């Protein structure tokens, strides 16, 4: 029954003298197998025998090479065309180049930005004015290269703050004693 299975192909293996024909030898050569199902008599359920035979015949036919268009360069014909496009004539008059005339400027910068119509200055909200002014040590923003260790109320010197706190505590203790 093993010889009569339909759809199974076994390639012939040449036996070497002294070779056992182990799994290493089998791994070197690809083996084509097709799945065999016992329910439908050895045929695959998705493909019929007719479809398989048609595909095998199509695979056996030699395929025609695709037609490629000829690709080449015709040097002689191209040089003749380009030579007529560029020609140098000695003693010929040069064509005069026209200088483009510029239109006279009628609009000024003020007219472009409508400065004349807007006579009163823009009003800024007070928050924006506050940010633009430097209010001494009470600057709300501390940004820039020279603003290291600067808080909302100016630069914070920890030594000076410690001295101030000690003096205020001593003053409070001295006042409490009296």
Swiss-Prot record:
Compartment(s) of residence: Nucleus
N6-acetyllysine modified-residue sites: 64, 150, 152
Residues recorded with modification Phosphothreonine: 139
Compositionally biased residues, Basic and acidic residues: 1-15
UniProt record, GO biological process: proteasome-mediated ubiquitin-dependent protein catabolic process; protein ubiquitination
Gene Ontology, cellular component aspect: nucleus
Comp. bias (Polar residues): 139-149
Complex formation: Interacts with UHRF2/NIRF.
Protein name: PEST proteolytic signal-containing nuclear protein
Species of the source: Mus musculus (Mouse)
Chain's gene name: Pcnp
């Amino acid at each position: 029954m093993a010889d009569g299975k339909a759809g199974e192909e076994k390639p012939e293996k040449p036996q070497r003298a002294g070779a056992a024909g182990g799994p290493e030898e089998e791994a070197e050569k690809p083996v084509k197998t097709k799945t065999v199902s016992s329910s439908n008599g050895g045929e695959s359920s998705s493909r019929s025998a007719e479809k398989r035979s048609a595909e095998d015949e199509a695979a056996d036919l030699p395929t025609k090479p695709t037609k490629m268009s000829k690709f080449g360069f015709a040097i002689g014909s191209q040089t003749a065309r380009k030579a007529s496009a560029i020609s140098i004539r000695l003693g010929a008059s040069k064509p005069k180049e026209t200088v483009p005339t510029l239109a006279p400027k009628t609009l000024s910068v003020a007219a472009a930005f409508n400065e004349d119509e807007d006579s009163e200055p823009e009003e800024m909200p007070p928050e924006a004015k506050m940010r633009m002014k430097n209010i001494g040590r009470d600057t709300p923003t501390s940004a820039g290269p020279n603003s290291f260790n600067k808080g909302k109320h100016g630069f914070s010197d920890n030594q000076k703050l410690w001295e101030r706190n000690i003096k205020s505590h001593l003053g409070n203790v001295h006042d409490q004693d009296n």
